[in-house]
């Protein structure tokens, strides 16, 4: 994300986890986010910095919680292992409800019978790497 001063920031969307490149539905998820962010002014609410130096943030466009929208549209999972420790309760409830809705409607990545969560995909990739 580029700020109003022209500085670029690496941002990780707070409390969601999207499919990794090479994983089913990754391109659709990425492209959906790109469409939302292209030529849009977004409000960034930084909550933390992760171990990779990325700003962890909520993104908003015209009042729309983009992170929540990614979950609602089946483009990401609610990252509950982190969220249950850090996310405000009202946001946690909204994100959990959005994921339940997307699952029930078989929206986006939930159209697959048993989509593999990105954290499990990463673990598989790490385990498959020769030591």
Model-derived features: where do they sit?
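Small beta-barrel nucleic-acid-binding modules, primarily SNase/OB-fold domains
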Residues: 1-131
């Amino acid at each position: 994300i580029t700020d109003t001063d022209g500085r670029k920031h690496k941002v990780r969307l707070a409390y969601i986890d999207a499919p990794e490149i090479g994983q089913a539905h990754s391109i659709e998820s990425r492209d959906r986010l790109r469409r939302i962010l292209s030529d849009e002014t977004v409000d960034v609410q930084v909550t933390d910095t992760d171990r990779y130096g990325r700003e962890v943030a909520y993104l908003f466009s015209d009042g729309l919680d983009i992170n929540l929208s990614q979950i609602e549209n089946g483009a990401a999972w609610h990252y509950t292992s982190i969220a249950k420790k850090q996310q405000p309760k009202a946001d946690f409830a909204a994100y959990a409800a959005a994921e339940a809705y997307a699952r029930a409607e078989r929206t986006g990545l939930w159209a697959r019978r048993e989509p593999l969560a990105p954290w499990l995909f990463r673990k598989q990739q790490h385990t498959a790497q020769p030591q």
